[in-house]
Swiss-Prot record:
Residues 1-29 are annotated as: Disordered. Binds 1 [4Fe-4S] cluster per subunit. The cluster is coordinated with 3 cysteines and an exchangeable S-adenosyl-L-methionine. Substrate binds at N231, M260, Y289, H325, S345, R346, G347, D386, G387, L388, R389, E425, Y452. Residues 1-24 have a biased composition (Polar residues). This is Phosphomethylpyrimidine synthase. GO terms for cellular component: cytosol. Homodimer. Catalyzes the synthesis of the hydroxymethylpyrimidine phosphate (HMP-P) moiety of thiamine from aminoimidazole ribotide (AIR) in a radical S-adenosyl-L-methionine (SAM)-dependent reaction. It catalyses: 5-amino-1-(5-phospho-beta-D-ribosyl)imidazole + S-adenosyl-L-methionine = 4-amino-2-methyl-5-(phosphooxymethyl)pyrimidine + CO + 5'-deoxyadenosine + formate + L-methionine + 3 H(+). It comes from Pseudomonas paraeruginosa (strain DSM 24068 / PA7) (Pseudomonas aeruginosa (strain PA7)). Keywords: 4Fe-4S, Iron, Iron-sulfur, Lyase, Metal-binding, S-adenosyl-L-methionine, Thiamine biosynthesis, Zinc.
């Protein structure tokens, strides 16, 4: 191992303070379920009292969904070398349908473990994996179909509600616009039974591998909060284990609900182990990437046996969902020939090349039922990959894209026959007028299995700003029914993202997802908006910053022009100044009404006009006066 690698592993002993410090005026709160080991984290944002001039009332705290795990809990000591605390082992043990294996069973996993040169690089506390007992199915879908509400399902119901009843009682939801959900069935409150029903129906998934016990359970489905995914991963051009773990902790701080490890460089197995042991959110992968590395990058040399071993290797580590491009069929490949941008999916191009080289059907398709057997033994969810997604708006909604989508619908039904959880990946590049057709087609072909899209990007003219071009499409398709949005950073099409790019991409997609939740009418979605709007009107600047998705940036922008502490209580900002602030003027109108005993603000405004008119006449009706 090089000196650089050793230094990187040593750095893993420490955590970037930026990723671990609590948010301003916030604290981690745990909501307890029906048993003491169901402890659901939410972030409580404390608010200042309304100033006396505005009524002087107390403002209740606002609770927001928290993906940051133990990292922002000052009561938890984080040691990346040991991994995060165990959340789920007891629940899994109680079900009595799994067994601890004597060791790793994949050939590649065993070979890596036996390689002494990797000792200083690997995660030191690798747990012995578990697997379903012979003949057992350990998927959350299997339990749901049997009518069982698991602790994971109860945990999720509490998490999705975020103290909704208390918020209603406190008046935080006195104003919420009705949504338009395009046929989604969103209840006024999420219950454990509703979670079970949605998972049993296949409309939602709980990605939760039995070997990822550090996981804080979450759900992906159109009748729940819209989720976002962030991507990390090394490449042949660089990055280290330390950098990838840092990207993970940074991404979940800002709101990534799941993270995909798309590593294609060195030490993929070891990097993934460090990520999983330190991740409170589901981790997804594209197993064909690692399988390709095992054959030195030659797609034609891939075999079912190599891929199968890769699935088992990653399932035993704890990967929660696999992107598998089983819908790239030989007959669809010629349909991409006249495209502007051809096949842009890495996984799709790998499988297309294999199909053409052997002139055989995609082995992921022909071995799909065998893949299902592996998935249900570890409760790994399918993310059925869209290997033929459009890479330009010119190619959107073509025969290749929709042909593959129809095949993904067929595969969904096969997976459901095995009680394996499924979500469907979607585009890509789609102009705004074609986005709803994508969503409607997916709901029809895939029987409402959750949709998971990359954007889509709505135009191709903005390299460097594709987080915006895609954020527009993401908000739209999230409203139409997409369950999870894969973030796009400003570096899309240009290079590997750094920490700042990751944050920008996640914040952009949190905005898109939240806008979709508002539009769908998700219960409680407007609580944060109402609280921030009230703080804005009352010039509670610190509360405005702290209620935002990115308090640091909001505070920094304000302080660029008004850096003094006194500006944090001023009744204006640098945009309009003290004399032209619309909210200050509105408050003055209200004060005038109160002083003059007028109950209607419009009457107060009219009275003010009359007063000024009388003054104009008294002063001689002169338009211009010498001053």
């Amino acid at each position: 191992m090089s000196a650089t690698q050793k230094n990187n592993i040593t750095r893993l002993e420490q955590l970037d303070r930026q990723s671990t410090q609590p948010f301003p005026n916030s604290r981690k709160v745990y909501l307890t379920g029906s048993r003491p080991d169901i402890r659901v984290p939410v972030r409580e944002i404390s608010l200042a009292d309304t100033p006396t001039a505005f009524g002087g009332e107390k403002n209740p705290p606002v609770f927001v969904y928290d993906t940051s795990g133990p990292y922002t809990d000052p009561e938890v000591r984080i040691d990346l070398r040991k991994g995060l605390p165990d959340v789920r082992s007891r629940w899994i043990d109680e079900r009595g349908d799994t067994e601890i294996l004597p060791g790793l069973t994949s050939e590649f996993g065993q070979a890596r473990l036996a390689d002494a040169s990797l000792d200083a690089l690997r995660f030191a506390h690798v747990r012995t994996p578990r697997r379903a007992k012979p003949g057992a199915n350990v998927s959350q879908m299997h339990y749901a179909k049997k009518g069982i509400i698991t602790p994971e399902m109860e945990y999720i119901a509490i998490r999705e509600n975020m103290k909704l009843q208390e918020a209603r009682a406190a008046g935080l939801l006195d104003q919420q616009h009705p949504g338009h959900s395009f046929g989604a069935n969103i209840p006024k409150e999420i219950t454990p039974e509703f979670v079970r029903e949605e998972v049993a129906r296949g409309r939602a998934i709980i990605p939760a591998n039995i070997n990822h016990t550090e996981l804080e359970p979450m759900i992906i489905g159109r009748n729940f909060l819209v989720k976002i995914n962030g991507n990390i991963g090394n490449s042949a051009l660089g990055s280290s284990i330390e950098e990838e773990v840092e990207k993970l902790t940074w991404g979940i701080r800002w709101g990534a609900d799941t993270v995909m490890d798309l590593s294609t460089g060195k030490h993929i197995h070891e990097t993934r182990e460090w990520i999983l042991r330190n991740s409170p959110v589901p981790i997804g992968t594209v197993p064909i990437y690692q399988a390709l590395e095992k054959v030195n990058g030659v797609a034609e040399d891939l075999t079912w046996e190599i891929f199968r071993d890769t699935l088992i290797e990653q399932a035993e580590q704890g990967v929660d969902y696999f992107t598998i491009h089983a819908g790239v069929l030989l007959r669809y490949v010629p349909l991409t020939a006249k495209r502007v941008t051809g096949i842009v999916s890495r996984g799709g191009s790998i499988m297309a090349k294999w199909c053409l080289a052997h002139h055989k059907e995609n082995f992921l398709y022909t071995h799909f039922e065998e893949i299902c057997e592996i998935m249900k033994a570890y409760d790994v969810s399918f993310s059925l990959g869209d290997g033929l997604r459009p890479g330009s708006v010119a190619d959107a909604n073509d025969a290749a894209q929709f042909g593959e989508l129809e095949t993904l619908g067929e595969l969904t039904k096969i997976a459901w026959k095995h009680d394996v959880q499924v979500m469907i990946e979607g585009p890509g590049h789609v102009p705004m007028q074609l986005i709803k057709e994508n969503m409607d087609k997916q709901l029809e072909c895939c029987d409402e299995a959750p949709f998971y899209t990359l954007g889509p990007l709505t135009t191709d003219i903005a390299p460097g700003y594709d987080h915006i071009t895609s954020g527009i499409g993401a908000a739209m398709i999230g409203w139409f029914g997409c369950a999870m949005l894969c973030y796009v950073t400003p570096k899309e099409h240009l290079g590997l993202p750094n920490k700042d790019d990751v944050k920008t991409g996640i914040i952009t997609y949190k905005i898109a997802a939240h806008a979709a939740d508002l539009a769908k009418g998700h219960p409680g979605a407007q609580i944060r908006d109402n609280a921030l709007s009230k703080a804005r009107f009352e010039f509670r600047w610190e509360d405005q910053f702290n209620l935002g998705l990115d308090p640091d940036t909001a505070r920094a922008f304000h302080d660029e022009t008004l850096p003094k502490d006194s500006a944090k209580v001023a009744h204006f900002c640098s945009m309009c100044g003290p004399k032209f602030c619309s909210m200050k003027i509105t408050q003055e109108v209200r004060d005038y009404a109160k002083e003059n005993g007028l109950s209607d603000e419009s009457k107060a405004i009219e009275a003010g006009f009359q007063e000024q008119a009388a003054r104009f006449k008294d002063e001689g009706s002169v338009i211009y006066k010498q001053v």
